[in-house]
């Protein structure tokens, strides 16, 4: 019997993870909202690059990567930038943690889909 996938649990947890924990926000934002907004802006920028500057970028791929770019935060939450980038050594360690979470998220998919999503979820592959 195939192993059960928990991938959707990772993704559907995104609205529960709040961003900007140390900042006052008029309207609290979660990583699902953030990822959606980033996907829209990224898609538009790719279209502009192609139409105005003779680019050769796939806007759909750019938008897809943007939708998943914070998936690892469903494991450890949103780490605030002043902490994450306090110095180069700390930043490297946080990137390692994010990589482990990205791999865990990827491993939550059935094996037959992992090759497709590896290039979307694992930041080192993007």
Regions found by a protein language model. Give the residues of each.
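Acidic/histidine-enriched, beta-strand-rich ligand/metal-binding domains
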Residues: 20-26, 32-35, 51, 67, ...
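Short alpha-helical hairpin
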Residues: 4-22
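Membrane-helix exit/interface motif
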Residues: 46-50, 72-83, 109-118
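Active-site alpha-helical segments that house and flank conserved acidic catalytic motifs
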Residues: 40-46, 60-79
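Divalent-cation-assisted or electrostatically stabilized phosphate/pyrophosphate-binding catalytic cores
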Residues: 86-102
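Alpha-helical phosphate/pyrophosphate-handling elements in metalloenzyme active cores
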Residues: 27-60
